[in-house]
């Protein structure tokens, strides 16, 4: 007998403002529970120390979470100078203390080094896997394993302030960039060591900062629904962003209802102005209803790659 799914069918993206001190998975499970969603997934973990934007995909939106994982990110970070820790943040143990003594010119030179395309060796305290196990598990056992340097791109690195031994920076970077590693490397370049004491993700892709919602706000809305006999769809669903915002940067290909029937059954179709080697966003008819993403196949036809199940949301 087929297992019945639990929770309601609800599709969309929640821009969660994650609190400090909790794992991304804990935050994900809380959001899933509040919305009573049958399916949920996040789009790239934030460290427990970190706060800020954590897009949570519900329902069919989970099919496009990888595209947000691959998106550019922006962070506000404060580093404590003069102390290096084993995790490169304040959750770790202090392993070295040094005097803070550098000039503004030396700081400017060091910051310039990190701008643009560089290679970065990931921290041992990361979720990257080696032989099927996350690096942080090896690190906790005192085992260091080989890590390959990976290309990253820091599009912007802006100096915000230097107050005493606390340096605050604004960093706009590509996927896979470890801010803790930049902070640790910067501290070594300055000769004093450094570690992260505050990290806030302020942007993922082009999502607006003011659309974020906290777990506390969600909890209050659920309590309101209970107190006023309202449905979750009435109090929570207005917070959801459309699932196609995860692929809003893709070119739109609008097809007729007739062609859509073929596409939705997994068949490629002939369309005009189809870009080569690019994923496209597929919409249907005058209403431009989003149904998924596709790509040109070897025959020059639009082939579906990932399609959604069209259904009505539940209360």
From Swiss-Prot:
Q: Which residues form a coiled coil?
A: none
What keywords are annotated for this sequence in UniProt?
Isomerase, tRNA processing
Q: Which Gene3D superfamilies match?
A: Pseudouridine synthase (3.30.2350.10), PUA domain (2.30.130.10)
Q: Name the active site residues.
A: 47 (nucleophile)
**Gene Ontology BP annotations:** mRNA pseudouridine synthesis; tRNA pseudouridine synthesis
Q: What class of enzyme is it?
A: isomerase
Q: Which CDD domains match?
A: PseudoU_synth_EcTruB (cd02573), PUA_TruB_bacterial (cd21152)
Tell me which EC number(s) this protein carries: 5.4.99.25
> A Pfam family for this UniProt protein?
TruB-C_2
**Which molecular function GO terms apply here?**
RNA binding; tRNA pseudouridine(55) synthase activity
Q: Which reaction does it catalyse?
A: uridine(55) in tRNA = pseudouridine(55) in tRNA
Domain of life (superkingdom): Bacteria
Report the sequence similarity comment from the record: Belongs to the pseudouridine synthase TruB family. Type 1 subfamily.
HAMAP family xrefs: TruB_bact
Q: Which PANTHER family match?
A: PSEUDOURIDYLATE SYNTHASE TRUB1, TRNA-PSEUDOURIDINE SYNTHASE
Summarizing the function annotation, the protein's role is: Responsible for synthesis of pseudouridine from uracil-55 in the psi GC loop of transfer RNAs.
Instruction: Indicate what this protein is called per its UniProt record.
Output: tRNA pseudouridine synthase B
């Amino acid at each position: 007998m087929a297992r019945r799914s639990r929770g309601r069918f609800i599709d969309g993206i929640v821009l969660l403002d994650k609190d400090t001190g909790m794992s991304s998975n804990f935050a994900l499970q809380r959001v899933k529970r509040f919305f009573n969603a049958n399916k949920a997934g996040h789009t790239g973990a934030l460290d427990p120390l970190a706060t800020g934007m954590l897009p949570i995909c519900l329902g069919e939106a989970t099919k496009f979470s990888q595209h947000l994982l691959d998106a550019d990110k922006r962070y506000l970070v404060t580093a404590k100078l003069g102390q290096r820790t084993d995790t490169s943040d304040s959750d770790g143990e202090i392993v070295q203390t040094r005097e803070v003594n550098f000039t503004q010119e030396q700081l400017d030179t060091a910051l310039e080094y990190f701008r643009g395309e560089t290679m970065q060796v990931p921290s041992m305290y990361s979720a990257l896997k080696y032989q099927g196990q996350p690096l942080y598990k090896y690190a906790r056992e005192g085992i260091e394993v080989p890590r390959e340097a990976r290309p990253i791109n820091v599009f912007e690195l802006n100096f915000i302030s230097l107050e005493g031994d606390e340096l605050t920076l604004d960093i706009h970077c590509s996927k896979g960039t470890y801010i803790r590693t930049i902070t640790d490397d910067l501290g070594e370049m300055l000769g004093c060591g450094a570690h992260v004491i505050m990290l806030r993700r302020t942007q993922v892709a082009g999502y607006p900062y003011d659309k974020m919602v906290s777990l506390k706000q969600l909890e209050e809305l659920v309590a309101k629904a209970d107190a006023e006999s309202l449905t979750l769809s009435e109090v929570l669903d207005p917070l959801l962003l459309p699932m196609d915002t995860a692929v809003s940067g893709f070119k739109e290909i609008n097809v007729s209802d007739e062609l859509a029937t073929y596409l939705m059954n997994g068949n490629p179709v002939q369309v005009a102005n189809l870009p080569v080697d690019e994923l496209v966003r597929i919409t249907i008819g005058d209403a431009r209803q989003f149904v998924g993403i596709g790509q040109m196949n070897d025959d020059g036809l639009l082939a579906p790659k990932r399609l959604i199940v069209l259904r009505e949301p539940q209360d």
